[in-house]
Amino acid sequence: MRNIQEHPGFYVVGITARTNNAQEMSGNGKIGDVWQTFLQPSLVAKIPNKIGVDPIAVYTDYETDHTGHYTYLLGLPASPVEALPANLTVKHIPAGRYAVFSSDRGPLEQVVPEIWQRIWSMSPEELGGMRSFKTDFEIYDQRAADPENAQIDVYVGLH
């Protein structure tokens, strides 16, 4: 059963890396380092105007599709920010239609790649529309508090 949601726009403030899925799957990716940096309490304390505690991972600035480079932003939802500390970035997640998928429960390093591989293999009909490749995001709520028995939701932007 497809879960298509109209999602309001919001802001995420955090840290970024430019990467691609081939690099991430090879073991030479940057996302693990982004998480290590983000999880330092001193970094989270610097995020201004936080309006939530659940980390959000944003995939944006796609070069092409899921095979090209993209910007990965890991942060927290925040109200609009004008001045940011060094090394932090703000991105606006646009309002729009998103297909929502829940991962299986298990170790994060296993369930996150698995859900994305399922999404990449889906036809537009299975997704509920054509992917926009503008912005996708993952929400790490309380179900992801235990990294060895976690579940996340993935929001895939649609046209």
Walk through the language-model features, giving the residues of each.
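A solvent-exposed interaction/effector surface
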Residues: 1-159
